[in-house]
Each structure stands twice: as structure tokens, then as C-alpha cells.
């Protein structure tokens, strides 16, 4: 299985094979997940001080904050999948 990388904004790249979900940060359960990840030192803030627009949860229980919309990240992920099928 080839490693697929996805840009999550500002030159930050994540292994697409490790992503479980991409969600919006507004709901209380997601805010709780972010706080728990911060407490466990499993939070990666890739927003460069900008507003968090997407929360990426990985299979290693890392939580990654991104300033890019969840739809944009999902589109980049889908585009990468389509390119690998060719």
C-alpha cells in the first residue's frame, strides 16, 4: 500500500491512510475530544493561529486541527484516491 499524503493547509501534510474522520469543531462532543487530546498530549495544532475549521482524527488517536474547511480536506482526500486508481 502506497503512502498517500494530503495537504491540510499552510504546508502541513498528513498521511491520508491514517485518517479516520474529518469533522467540524463546533459541536460539544468534538470540543471535548479536542480537550481530551490536549490533556493527553495527542493534539497537533496546524492552524498557525487561525480559526479551527476542521478536526482530523487519526487511527493513532491523534487529533489534528486545521484551518481548512472539512469539505476542502475531504475533496483533497477524494482527489488523491482518484489519482491513485489511475
Curated annotation (Swiss-Prot):
InterPro entries: RemA-like. Pfam families: RemA-like. NCBIfam families: MtxBflmRegRemA, PRK04323.1. HAMAP family: RemA. Belongs to the RemA family. This is Putative regulatory protein BBR47_37350.
Amino acid at each position: 500500500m502506497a503512502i498517500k499524503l494530503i495537504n491540510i493547509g499552510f504546508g502541513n501534510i498528513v498521511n491520508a491512510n491514517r485518517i479516520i474522520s474529518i469533522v467540524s469543531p463546533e459541536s460539544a462532543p468534538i470540543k471535548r475530544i479536542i480537550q481530551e487530546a490536549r490533556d493527553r498530549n495527542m493534539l497537533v495544532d496546524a492552524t498557525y493561529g487561525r480559526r479551527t475549521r476542521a478536526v482530523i482524527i487519526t487511527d493513532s488517536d491523534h487529533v489534528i486541527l486545521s484551518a481548512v474547511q472539512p469539505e476542502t480536506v475531504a475533496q483533497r482526500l477524494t482527489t488523491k484516491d482518484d489519482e491513485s486508481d489511475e
